C-alpha cells in the first residue's frame, strides 16, 4: 500500500511530490477531499499519536490560540477531522511505515524507502 496526502496549494508539498517517485501511489488532495476518520485512524496507528499528525504551523493554530491550551489526543483528532489545514503535510504511507511532514530527514527516509 502506498498513499500520499497533500495540499495542492502548498508549494512545499508540490516540491516534495516532484522530488520523490510517486508512481504507484494513491494521492489524495486534502482540501478537495479531506481525510476521513478511517484514514486518520490508519495514520494514527502507524504514527502512534494524533499530535504527531497535527500541524502546529497552521494559521488557525495561531489565530485560535491553541498553543496556550492543553490539547488532548482526542482534541487533536477532532481538530484534524474538522479542518484540513491541521493535518501536517505531506503524509506518505508506504507499506507499514508513515512519513509525516517536510523535514529533510523525513523526505530522505521516504526516498530511501521507495527507491
Mark where each language-model region is.
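Thiol/selenol-based redox catalytic cores and closely related redox-interacting motifs
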Residues: 33-110, 114-115
Amino acid at each position: 500500500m502506498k498513499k500520499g496526502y497533500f495540499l495542492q496549494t502548498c508549494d512545499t508539498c508540490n516540491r516534495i511530490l516532484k522530488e520523490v517517485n510517486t508512481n504507484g501511489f494513491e494521492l489524495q488532495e486534502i482540501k478537495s477531499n479531506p481525510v476521513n476518520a478511517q484514514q486518520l485512524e490508519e495514520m494514527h496507528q502507524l504514527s502512534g499519536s494524533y499530535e504527531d499528525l497535527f500541524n502546529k504551523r497552521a494559521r488557525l493554530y495561531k489565530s485560535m490560540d491553541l498553543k496556550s491550551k492543553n490539547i488532548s489526543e482526542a482534541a487533536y483528532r477532532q481538530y484534524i477531522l474538522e479542518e484540513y489545514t491541521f493535518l501536517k503535510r505531506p503524509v506518505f504511507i508506504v507499506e507499514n511505515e508513515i512519513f509525516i511532514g517536510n523535514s529533510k530527514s523525513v523526505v530522505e527516509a521516504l526516498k530511501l524507502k521507495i527507491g
